[in-house]
Amino acid sequence: MPTLYTHSDSNKRKTWLLLSVFFMSIILIGYVFSYAMESSAILYFAVIFSVVSSFISYWWSDKIVLKMSNAKLIKFEENKELYRIVENLCITAGLPTPRIYIIQDSAPNAFATGRDPEHAVVAVTSGLLEKLDRSELEGVIAHELSHIGNRDILLATLVTVLVGVVVLLADFFRRWTFFGSHRRRSDSKGGGQLQLIMLILAIVLSILAPIFAYLMQFAISRKREFAADADGALLTRYPEGLAMALEKISADPEPLEAANRATAHLYISSPFKKHTPYPSQEGNKKKGFFARAMMTHPPMEERVAALRGMDVKK
């Protein structure tokens, strides 16, 4: 029989691996640019920037995400029913009760963030509270608590911040390269062949790095959603509640105003809507590999089908 939070240790390792890969990638890009530009200052800047970014991401990434989402902390008196649902599920799951935030937005959605279960946050939109019944809301909260129990909230939040850093640095280095190469052409008639190769490599890296960063972000997001769906259903012992909630959230035509591309993968369902219910399975099959790779969430009908195929009676 499946048990809760079997992905916890794996996600701890993935978090440290992510930080290590990020750190080494920035140093590699910085080294290539330093060689191409004949300036060691670029490498020093890359090292310092990656260390500071990793530190900030670990300790304050949740606050950054909450600020970006316009989420506001609420007290027990402001929504007693929501607090009781969260507290009851936390007791069942053996988790500390997270802080609860509300996003004033009519689009139904939710996410969890924080560096560990002791510093976790669950954020839900006002639209979610208005449009779901109790069993559906319990399913959504159980899904978010499963992200907390599996300790993948830090992984997901770090990805949000670090992908933004990679994109920012890549753009900065690319602009620096064009400026520096133009200035060197003015000072000399030519450079070494190796330096020219490194310059081309630097430009290619600055273009490809953000693409690979986004692909990694989306891949992590899709995998963690399936795991949280399964664990959420185990927690409530009622997969149909979460399945119905996902159908309602997906079919709702309103986009989430506070969402952006950096935080989209954190939500239980993509916050960007096209004013249509979730696409058919046939429609998803017609999508190309790259289109599917760029999806922040698994196809909704696959998630719903997986939930309705679960047996949690034992």
Where are these regions (language model features)?
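Hydrophobic alpha-helical transmembrane segments of integral membrane proteins
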Residues: T160, I203-I207
